[in-house]
Amino acid sequence: MDIRWIPLVGKTGYILAAGALIPTYILNDREIVLVDSGLHYDPGLVSFIRAVDVSVYAVLQTHLHEDHVANNRILISRFGTRIIAHRNEVEAVHSRQKMRASWSEIRPETKDKYLRTYSYGIESIENGQEEIVLRDSAFKIVPLYGHSEGHLGFVTPDGVLCTGDAILSPALVQHSKMPYFEDIGQSIDSMKKLLQTDYPYYALAHMEVLEKRDMPGLVKKNLALLERIHVDILELINDPVTLDELVVSVMYGLGIRFRDETRNGYLRNTISQRVRYLVETGRLCKIKSDGEIRYGR
């Protein structure tokens, strides 16, 4: 990918680099802000930024999944960049206990890799905080929980909402079989919240910017995808089954098992969250039988 900067509105634009669309805001003649830092490590990103004679003052993290933080270390090293995320995200990646609670199906070695990945300082955004001011520029904070525990959207001073992974892009919503969300109920609430917003542009991870007129249709497609997945899960259940049995049935029944066990761990985790949501909404029953928890319709 050729690295380039695309202007959008006012001082807001985006850099196409590191396998992603990285939203940017120009703070002043010498400093910019990024929203997330890319899907892949890309040393060319720093070279590009230096070539235009600016530095990265801060990275606002929609969340701290590894496909959004790939260039944090090099930005800190080269520019002394501030990394800023919701407190719940910071705690999740710095605590084995929090990881165990959030990612019960993720392999221990993957959790250890996360702890090593985030062994740098991250500033926290607190619950209820409505904005963050960087230099003299105020960025509105929009809680969009669900994909992860502390997932946030950020509105640039020009009115561009950076949604992170709160909603799937048009391309992804067409092809995803089991998109990853840590809390399905919160994800649905966040998608519905997006319907109530009124911004001229929405920067989606990882490769698309949409205009306001296109968002309602995309939200409805996302909600329809989640409902279709829930119906598919319910249709795979005949007799009551354990969670492990149901997870395996969904993986094979929907044809979404991977060779990579790390990816299977994420998959098992998000299937488990969907089962929990179906129980919470009364569409699945949780049955205790012979000392085991089973799930039935």
Task: Spell out what each predicted region is.
Residues M1-A51, G153-G164:
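Conserved beta-strand hairpin/beta-sheet module of binuclear metal-dependent hydrolase folds
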Residues L34-G38, V56-D67, I84-R87, P143-G146, ...:
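Active-site neighborhood of phospho(di)ester-bond hydrolases with catalytic His/Asp-centered motifs
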Residues L39-V133:
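Active-site HxH/HxHxD metal-binding segment of metal-dependent hydrolases
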Residues E235-R297:
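C-terminal regulatory/interaction regions
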Residues V69, S187, I271:
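Aromatic/hydrophobic pocket-lining residues that form the small-molecule binding cavity
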Residues A17-A20, E126, Y145-S148:
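A short catalytic or substrate-binding loop motif that flags glycine-/basic-rich loops and adjacent residues
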Residues R228-L236:
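Pre-recognition alpha-helix immediately N-terminal to the DNA-recognition helix
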Residues A138-E227:
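Metallo-beta-lactamase
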